[in-house]
């Protein structure tokens, strides 16, 4: 989200420590910033998972300043799992919405692993 207190030096140190620790199996990436996800994937390699909130089929800004990116783009950029909240629970048909997110993420995975 905009205005967070993280800075690049802090983020790098946290990621480097996590990569080096066998007990860390993954990281949370930013779904609204595919370039940052790709950089995180390049840093952590394929041995760690990346879980990604901040995705929505309706790409854009949320009502509380959060940003949403495309779920397919998130997976193409290196995410292993998308985390979806309001895109499903606020949908008129949550089951259909969940299926749409599954389809979008699966599409990204097939394209990524081509």
Outline where the language-model segments fall.
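Short flexible/disordered coil segments
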Residues: 4-7, 55-66, 89-93, 109-114
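Electropositive phosphate-/nucleotide-binding environments in soluble metabolic enzymes
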Residues: 8, 12, 34, 68, ...
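Generic beta-sheet signal
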Residues: 51-53, 85
């Amino acid at each position: 989200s905009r205005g967070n207190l993280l800075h690049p030096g802090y983020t790098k140190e946290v990621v480097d420590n996590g990569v080096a620790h066998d007990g860390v199996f993954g990281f949370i990436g930013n779904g609204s910033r595919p370039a940052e996800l790709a950089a995180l994937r390049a840093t952590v390699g394929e041995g760690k998972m990346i879980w990604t909130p901040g995705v929505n089929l309706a790409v854009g800004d949320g009502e509380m300043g959060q940003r949403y990116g495309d779920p397919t783009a998130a997976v193409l950029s290196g995410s292993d799992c998308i985390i979806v909240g309001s895109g499903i629970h606020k949908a008129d048909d949550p089951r259909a919405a969940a299926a749409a997110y599954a389809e979008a993420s699966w599409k990204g995975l097939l394209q990524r692993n081509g």
